[in-house]
Amino acid sequence: MRTLALLAAILLVTLQAQAELHSGMADDGVDQQQPRAQDLDVAVYIKQDETSPLEVLGAKAGVSCTCRRFSCGFGERASGSCTVNGVRHTLCCRR
């Protein structure tokens, strides 16, 4: 599987290099004062409205969930992850 991923990465880099070479030849007649798309810095921020896992699991009767730093305790099951102060933890739930 790693070999396949490595070969795919090499193929993509090769294709990108060829595309840049061909676009460089085509752009020789273009005014050098115009910025190219690759020269522009773009920042994209995406924010989604999400329901927290605690709200989803807490809606079921008899479910109690806790954010744990390491692993779930006896009788608890890992049900996802949660973030506390920017640190990702394990979401452990008990029925």
Curated annotation (Swiss-Prot):
Keyword Translocase: no
Keywords: Antibiotic, Antimicrobial, Defensin, Disulfide bond, Secreted, Signal
Signal peptide: 1-19
A GO CC term attached to the entry: extracellular space
SMART domains: Defensin_propep, DEFSN
Subcellular localization: Secreted
Disulfide bond entries: C65-C93, C67-C82, C72-C92
Propiece residues: 20-62
Pfam name, any one: Defensin_propep
A GO BP annotation: disruption of plasma membrane integrity in another organism
InterPro entries in UniProt: Alpha-defensin, Alpha-defensin_C, Alpha-defensin_N, Beta/alpha-defensin_C
Similarity comment text for this entry: Belongs to the alpha-defensin family.
PANTHER family documented for this protein: ALPHA-DEFENSIN 1
Reported function: Microbicidal activity.
Protein name as annotated: Neutrophil antibiotic peptide NP-4
Source lineage: Eukaryota, Metazoa, Chordata, Craniata, Vertebrata
